[in-house]
Amino acid sequence: MTATMRLALALTSVTLVLAGCRYSADDKPVATQPTELQQAAADLLQGQVMAVAYSGFREGQHPDRGDGANNPTPEQILEDLNILVEHDFGLIRLYDAGENSRTTLELIRENDLPIKVLQGLWLNAEFSNHEGCPWLNEPIPEAELAANTEKNVAEVAKGIALANEFSDIIVSVNVGNEALVSWTDHMVPLDNVIAYVREVKAAIEQPVTVAENYEWWIAEGKPLAAELDYVGVHTYPAWEDKPIDEGLSYTIENMNRVHAALPDSTLAILEAGWATTASEFADRASEANQARYYEDLDGWASKANVTVFFFEAFDEPWKGNPDNPAGAEKHWGLFFVDRTPKAYFRDD
């Protein structure tokens, strides 16, 4: 290599370094901040800013945990849907293609309710993440993993059928929920998730997404994002020790970082919320903080054109540790389990 070529390469390297940094007064490089996320109004899902995650399990009800499900009745689900309509929710997120989701879709159609649906497909563990998940104490047996794969294949088929049967209501399909993050108890290998996404996209007209924590998208999300119509992000400042005064700014920071990592992707928040009771972070959990976080998110998302599915509509007592009634997992609802409103929707 000649001296001229070495000089040219050196100058090129300096140029590339400077392109990613700015200089302060003392000529020390300072990393630039991610570009502020600003989307077009057309990037909103169904033109909606604030949407909500919906699951209808009430006191004493629960999904199948190995001993059968105790599901809400159609009358109870209809009551829930009417509450959501009354509070101006026109877009809800469902998490699986099972019986409750079909009932919900049928009730929306039969009662001509002004609600559209992000339909979820739940993926069970196809890989034993006992070394990464804090609450998996032993490996998942191979036979169970094989059975889960069969369940996932069936779930995808049911989800495709629902999306086509209820194409007037289902406006998008979400394949998997936190099945890729390092701490999940229902991990599915990335290649398998991509295969499911491709199968769904080939069979329906609606846009397809996947829901994962923001950190996963930043670190590992490019191959999957390239397959999707938009990227579904989860972000929970309260779980990450942030006080309410930093709730919105931390959420925006997370979204800006995802945007920097995936600049060609449209983004939506598929879960963000604030628990009103939480033994895990009691000093930050309150109705007032939830109301503020909702209002702050609404204000930012309206300007940035980001659809937000607030987590969640109603408290769900079946979740989390049954011996800890104050556990956060039970208390994310905008409404109590008896369907009375919390602070944001309450006329005090």
Feature-to-residue mapping (PLM):
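C-terminal motif of bacterial Sec signal peptides marking the signal peptidase cleavage site
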Residues: 18-20
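Aromatic-rich peripheral "rim/lid" segments of glycoside hydrolase catalytic domains that contact
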Residues: 24, 29-43, 47, 283-287, ...
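Acidic (Asp/Glu)-rich catalytic clusters
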Residues: 41-46, 82-86, 103-114, 159-169, ...
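N-terminal carbohydrate-binding/catalytic regions of secreted carbohydrate-active enzymes
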Residues: 47-133
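Substrate-binding cleft of extracellular glycoside hydrolase catalytic domains
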Residues: 104-206
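Aromatic- and acid-rich polysaccharide-binding/catalytic face
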Residues: 119-121, 130-132, 171, 177, ...
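Active-site clefts of carbohydrate-active enzymes
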Residues: 181, 185, 235-239, 263-292, ...
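Aromatic-lined carbohydrate-recognition surfaces of secreted/lumenal glycan-active proteins
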Residues: 197-218, 264-273, 307-317
